[in-house]
């Protein structure tokens, strides 16, 4: 995972000593106190490249293909049903997707023993870094860089939306990059079908990238929520600062209205709740800022597209297809090179009655599909 050519190195602290287990079919590694037990085809050095609430991610090499991969360990994956559903959802979704701008799942490591199946290891194609790291770095970003990132993000999102899926958690750290500046959407654990209109209680998407309709608990949200997030990401990539770093819901809405102006009554039609409409009307009123003055270092085309994404009323927000046709992206846009998903994704496996044990069995079956040769 050498990104020195474009992005600089993050150091190389690795774990190369493993202990063979289960007759040599698996190897255990200790990575900063974290136990990693993987199929023997994944060979060291194992290098930690990421960490989150779910666990840790290590880079390794698949000795059978010579390919470098990223292995995410989700420890005690079935202790919490919401987290377990999220893991299952991501596995199913990414298996369904096949697009240059969506991260690919290469393997779900089959556990040595079904009865002791508690940790899930998902193997992805390896990327060098993510957009959050690049924004925070000293790496110079030109308008062409930003345009290329945005184009790839929208190209991937067009495919995702065509599969009848909303990502719902787009943010710079979920946009993975390699040294060629290729971009891929990652982390589909919060994704939902477009037809699901219930407000998800476990919704934890980072507040800074959350659309107004979600901040206002609008239950019937659409693909427009992802476009709002794309606008936030575009602005942040250009300015190297988050557009709306709200401390809480109220502060978040205030930051939004300070930039795009307080909505008038005609922009509140998407709110079904009288209480929500009343709440918005009693908020402090702000005039719309001049975007060109607010973003002096952005090209006129980028500013115009940003204005069309950051629209309070989701029904008036630009769509992914319209955004791809915007003049700012004309140097890159080619509708024949922007494929859609052939089959819509089916979320029917997510029954309300699913138990932790059901989810464990469904994920176990996925490990067997990836590793049929290991099954008796």
UniProtKB/Swiss-Prot annotation:
Tissue-wise expression: Ubiquitous. Expressed in the veins and stomatal guard cells of leaf plates, petioles, stem, roots and flowers.
CDD domains: STKc_TEY_MAPK
One annotated Gene Ontology cellular component of this protein: cytoplasm
PTMs per UniProt: Dually phosphorylated on Thr-201 and Tyr-203, which activates the enzyme. Autophosphorylated on serine and tyrosine residues. Dephosphorylated by DSPTP1. Phosphorylated by MKK6 in vitro.
Catalytic EC class: transferase
EC numbers: 2.7.11.24
In-chain residues carrying the UniProt-annotated modification Phosphotyrosine: 203
Chain span(s) of sequence motif TXY: 201-203
Location of this chain's protein in the cell: Cytoplasm; Nucleus; Cytoplasm, Cytoskeleton
Pfam families: Pkinase
Source organism, top-level taxon: Eukaryota
GO-annotated biological processes: cellular response to carbon dioxide; cortical microtubule organization; cytokinesis by cell plate formation; hyperosmotic response; hypotonic salinity response; innate immune response; jasmonic acid and ethylene-dependent systemic resistance; jasmonic acid and ethylene-dependent systemic resistance, jasmonic acid mediated signaling pathway
Keywords: ATP-binding, Cytoplasm, Cytoskeleton, Immunity, Innate immunity, Kinase, Microtubule, Nucleotide-binding, Nucleus, Phosphoprotein, Plant defense, Serine/threonine-protein kinase, Stress response, Transferase
Free-text disruption phenotype from the record: Dwarf plants with cytokinetic defects in leaf epidermal cells. Abnormally developed and branched root hairs. Retarded root growth with the protrusion of many epidermal cells from roots. Heavily bundled and disoriented cortical microtubules resistant to oryzalin. Exhibits a seedling-lethality phenotype. Defects in the formation of the cell plate. Abnormal mature pollen grains. Abolished CO(2)-mediated stomatal closure.
Domain Protein kinase, residue spans: 43-329
Record function comment: The ANPs-MKK6-MPK4 module is involved in the regulation of plant cytokinesis during meiosis and mitosis. Essential to promote the progression of cytokinesis and for cellularization (formation of the cell plate) during male-specific meiosis. Involved in cortical microtubules organization and stabilization by regulating the phosphorylation state of microtubule-associated proteins such as MAP65-1. Involved in root hair development process. Negative regulator of systemic acquired resistance (SAR) and salicylic acid- (SA) mediated defense response.
Free-text note regarding domains: The TXY motif contains the threonine and tyrosine residues whose phosphorylation activates the MAP kinases.
Protein name: Mitogen-activated protein kinase 4
């Amino acid at each position: 995972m050498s990104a020195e050519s474009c992005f600089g190195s993050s150091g190389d602290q690795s774990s190369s000593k493993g202990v063979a287990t289960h007759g040599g079919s698996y190897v255990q590694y200790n990575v900063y106190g974290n136990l990693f037990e993987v199929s023997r085809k994944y060979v060291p050095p194992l290098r930690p490249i990421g960490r989150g609430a779910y666990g840790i991610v290590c880079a390794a090499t698949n000795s059978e293909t010579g390919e470098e991969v990223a292995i995410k360990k989700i420890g005690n994956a079935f202790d919490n049903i919401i987290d377990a559903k999220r893991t299952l959802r991501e596995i199913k979704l990414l298996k369904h997707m096949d697009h240059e701008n969506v991260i690919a799942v290469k393997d779900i490591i089959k556990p040595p023993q079904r009865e002791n199946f508690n940790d899930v290891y998902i193997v992805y194609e390896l990327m060098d870094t993510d957009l959050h790291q690049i924004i925070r770095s000293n790496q110079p970003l030109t308008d062409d860089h930003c345009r290329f990132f945005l184009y790839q993000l929208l190209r991937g999102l067009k495919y995702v939306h065509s599969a009848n899926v909303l990502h719902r958690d787009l943010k710079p750290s979920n946009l993975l990059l390699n040294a060629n500046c290729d971009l891929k959407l990652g982390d589909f654990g919060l994704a939902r079908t477009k037809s699901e209109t219930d407000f998800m209680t476990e919704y934890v998407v980072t507040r800074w990238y959350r659309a107004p309709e979600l901040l206002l608990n609008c239950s019937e949200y659409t693909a427009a929520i992802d476009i709002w997030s794309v606008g936030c990401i575009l602005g942040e990539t250009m300015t190297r600062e988050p557009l709306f770093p709200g401390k809480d819901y109220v502060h978040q809405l205030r930051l939004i209205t300070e930039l795009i102006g307080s909505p008038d009554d005609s922009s509140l039609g998407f709110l079904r709740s009288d209480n929500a409409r009343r709440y918005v009307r009693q908020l402090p009123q702000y005039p719309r800022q001049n975007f060109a003055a607010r973003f002096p270092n952005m090209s006129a085309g980028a500013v115009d597209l940003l204005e069309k994404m950051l629209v309070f009323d989701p029904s008036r927000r630009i769509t992914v297809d319209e955004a791809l046709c915007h003049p700012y992206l004309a140097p890159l846009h080619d509708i024949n090179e922007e494929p859609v998903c052939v089959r819509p994704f089916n979320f029917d496996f997510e029954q309300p009655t699913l138990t932790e044990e059901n989810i464990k069995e469904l994920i176990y079956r996925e490990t067997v599909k990836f590793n049929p040769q290991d099954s008796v």
